[in-house]
Amino acid sequence: MTERMILKVDHTGIDKPLLWTAILLALAGLVMVSSASLQIAETRLGDPFYYAMRHGIYLALGLGVGAFVYYAVPLALLERLRFVMLPVALVALVMVFIPGLGRTVNGSTRWIALPGLTIQASEIVKLCFVLYLAGYVAQRKAALETEWKAFLLPLGLLGVLMLLLLLEPDFGAVVVLGITAMGMLFLSGVPTLRFLLIGLIAVALGGLVAFAEPYRVARLMTFTDPWADQFGSGYQLTQSLIAFGRGHWFGVGLGNSVQKLFYLPEAHTDFVYAVMSEELGLLGNVALIGGFILLGWRVFRIGHRLEARGLLYHAYLVYGCAFVFCSQAFINLGVNMGLLPTKGLTLPFISYGGSSLLISAVMVGLILRAGAEADHLKARGRAAR
């Protein structure tokens, strides 16, 4: 690669609070996955550290991939390749429906099974769509503020991706993708009235989707009163709430959770936050939420600074990553606490899952790269004067 392809950046200007927040969240995730998965790993696989070791490997790979993205992937190259991102996302979604490639877990076909590797298609879709939409907004920002066509085009493409996600089904990914897209378009300056109209349509369609499948209706009914069927459809949520109740202020101690002993399903994946709350109590609970608030604030701050400097692609790429992190964390935490219906979403950096951890690491690398490139360009401008 030439120097033009790899833009030199000032690595001393890296956003250290963001970097360390992401690292600490990932390390906390490793600890909690290790604790929450001991019994289930020993029972299912005969090795209590199976999931912990795999998660550690994913974390190491994530650090390596994130570092590579930060040091060696110029955002100008990604901006030029933005039109490739949608075909990549579509291919990933179609692959889950190919016999022999798609893997079904708990009734959902969301994974691509490759030799020695399983990839969750929706994680690829989130990243690819953010990369595409950031480039679209950077090129069409003025048109987005005035033209319906410019606003509806990305929504139409989004609808295709959502349809394929619903066929898996993966309603949680649909919600995250929708929030991310609408958030990025809103920040681009699309008039509020258009959002209200689209919002009404989205709510109506969301209602139809929610009531089209019996299992979604059951989830909604369970969400309103999980104790009405605590040994049936409300079992997972009631066990999660029991975990929160047992935690009190300071928890029962790391490794001492009772709910992870086959009472709480998905204790090391979607509901690891409940186990964390049981073992570390309200103190650990608040610390984790504070970590995500700090992460979101730093990322949005970087995006705002980039937009103020006129680096629109950089800014909206960062905004998109921020919406993915914040919406997914908010939904997962809300589901664990019984504030939202069950969605089947992992908690970024914390839950067990290689695809989620790797894509999160890539996004952090892109965010840090965007900030570093902006600092380099600013310093080069001062030197030129």
Curated annotation (Swiss-Prot):
Q: Principal localization?
A: membrane
Identify the PANTHER family for this entry.
CELL CYCLE PROTEIN, PEPTIDOGLYCAN GLYCOSYLTRANSFERASE FTSW-RELATED
Disulfide pairings? none
- What is the recorded name of this protein? Probable peptidoglycan glycosyltransferase FtsW
Q: Extract one GO BP annotation from the record.
A: FtsZ-dependent cytokinesis
| Protein purpose | Peptidoglycan polymerase that is essential for cell division.
Instruction: Provide the protein's localization.
Output: Cell inner membrane
As recorded in UniProt, its EC number(s) are: 2.4.99.28
Q: How does it sit in the membrane?
A: Multi-pass membrane protein
> Which keywords does the record carry?
Cell cycle, Cell division, Cell inner membrane, Cell membrane, Cell shape, Cell wall biogenesis/degradation, Glycosyltransferase, Membrane, Peptidoglycan synthesis, Transferase, Transmembrane, Transmembrane helix
Q: Which reaction does it catalyse?
A: [GlcNAc-(1->4)-Mur2Ac(oyl-L-Ala-gamma-D-Glu-L-Lys-D-Ala-D-Ala)](n)-di-trans,octa-cis-undecaprenyl diphosphate + beta-D-GlcNAc-(1->4)-Mur2Ac(oyl-L-Ala-gamma-D-Glu-L-Lys-D-Ala-D-Ala)-di-trans,octa-cis-undecaprenyl diphosphate = [GlcNAc-(1->4)-Mur2Ac(oyl-L-Ala-gamma-D-Glu-L-Lys-D-Ala-D-Ala)](n+1)-di-trans,octa-cis-undecaprenyl diphosphate + di-trans,octa-cis-undecaprenyl diphosphate + H(+)
UniProt xrefs under HAMAP family = PGT_FtsW_proteobact
Which GO terms fall under molecular function for this chain's record? lipid-linked peptidoglycan transporter activity; peptidoglycan glycosyltransferase activity
Tell me a GO cellular component: cell division site
Write down the species: Alcanivorax borkumensis (strain ATCC 700651 / DSM 11573 / NCIMB 13689 / SK2)
Q: In which pathway does it act?
A: Cell wall biogenesis; peptidoglycan biosynthesis
Q: Which InterPro entries does UniProt cross-reference here?
A: Cell_cycle_FtsW-rel_CS (IPR018365), FtsW (IPR013437), FtsW/RodA (IPR001182)
Q: Which gene encodes it?
A: ftsW
Q: What class of enzyme is it?
A: transferase
Q: Which residues cross the membrane?
A: 18-38, 57-77, 81-101, 111-131, 157-177, 195-215, 280-300, 311-331, 347-367
Of which family is this protein a member?
Belongs to the SEDS family. FtsW subfamily.
Lineage runs: Bacteria, Pseudomonadati, Pseudomonadota, Gammaproteobacteria, Oceanospirillales
